[in-house]
Amino acid sequence: MSLKAIHVSEVPSLDHFPENPSLICSSRKANNKFVVVGHRGHGMNMSQSPDLRFSALKENSILSFNAASKFPLDFIEFDVQVTRDGCPIIFHDDFIYSEEQGVVYEKRVTEVCLSEFMSYGPQRDTGKTGKPLLRKSKEGKIHKWSVATDDSFCTLQEAFEKVENPNLGFNIELKLDDNVFYSSDHLSRLLLPILQVVSDIGNDRTIIFSSFHPDAALLVRKLQTTYPVFFLTNGGTEMYHDTRRNSLEEAIKVCLEGGLQGIVSEVKGVFRNPALVNKIKESKLSLMTYGKLNNVAEAVYMQHLMGIEGVIVDHVEEITEAVREMMKPSNRDADGTKPKPNFSDRELSFLLKLIPELIQH
């Protein structure tokens, strides 16, 4: 990949992106493909959840990525940040928490060097003991980051080198802090090292970039045209100072004005505004979703009926199996076009009106 100098005809995608990088569904429709993406690999961690699946494997780790690759996923999604010394690493949170002599402390991930980042948690060298790894919940509580099967942190380069399935796509989320102002120069310093790794060792792996930060998404599109860029949005389920982040309508504008290829919305944002699915498709943009509801097979099935092209999920095993059953030829009508149950337009319209009411609670 030569930054700023790649012809659009070389753009790959969720299903070998067409020369005009628009819809995933342009090729998806040809083979009725519904894309399933593993969230942070095999699923995110929520150590305090009673559901043990959320604490089975360390998220965003090579262990998690390779475990996810055993299932019929199209992509794994993971979060990339850049350390103080310019190394792209895979980690979700803005801060890393640890404890020394009973005192909890935090450090901003982008302000530590690679060697310090790698010193937290399990160590690859069996003779070393890593620093204790803690985590801050959304409620502000600090707790031990415990999982049943742990693994060390990893870099973006290692993901390319150690994820065993070469056909498993990478959805690289460009992770930035919502509470930090980034100038264009600052964004460039953060994005270029990531793009360089992809250029050097991306090889033939299918890749898409995504970001909640509109300027980061727009800039990565300007810096390269090899890989599609998706704008992540809460779809209006949360409010931000930057109004571009506050609705699906604004997300459409960002994509169309910046030449982005698609939107990844919180699924509740789509269910609350189902009419926008057609508007997004008419704009020749791809649409995928993320969120806890995507761990519910019925919610995933409803999205398939609505024309949404894919989902990011935590419960990889359960949802890939549900999608496999959903797409079986034996579960279709005689013409092979509509999976059962086959809702009438009136029934589907009723369901789409009902869902926004249900998810308000």
UniProtKB/Swiss-Prot annotation:
Knockout consequences: No visible phenotype under normal growth conditions, but mutant plants show reduced glycerophosphodiester phosphodiesterase activity under phosphate starvation.
UniProt-listed Gene3D superfamilies: Phosphatidylinositol (PI) phosphodiesterase
Localization per record: Plastid, Chloroplast
GO BP of this protein: cellular response to hypoxia; glycerol metabolic process; intracellular phosphate ion homeostasis; lipid metabolic process
Tissue specificity of this protein: Expressed in roots, shoots, rosette leaves, stems, flowers and siliques.
Main location: plastid
PANTHER family: GLYCEROPHOSPHOCHOLINE PHOSPHODIESTERASE GPCPD1, GLYCEROPHOSPHORYL DIESTER PHOSPHODIESTERASE
Listed name of the protein: Glycerophosphodiester phosphodiesterase GDPD1, chloroplastic
Organism whose genome encodes this protein: Arabidopsis thaliana
Species lineage: Eukaryota, Viridiplantae, Streptophyta, Embryophyta, Tracheophyta
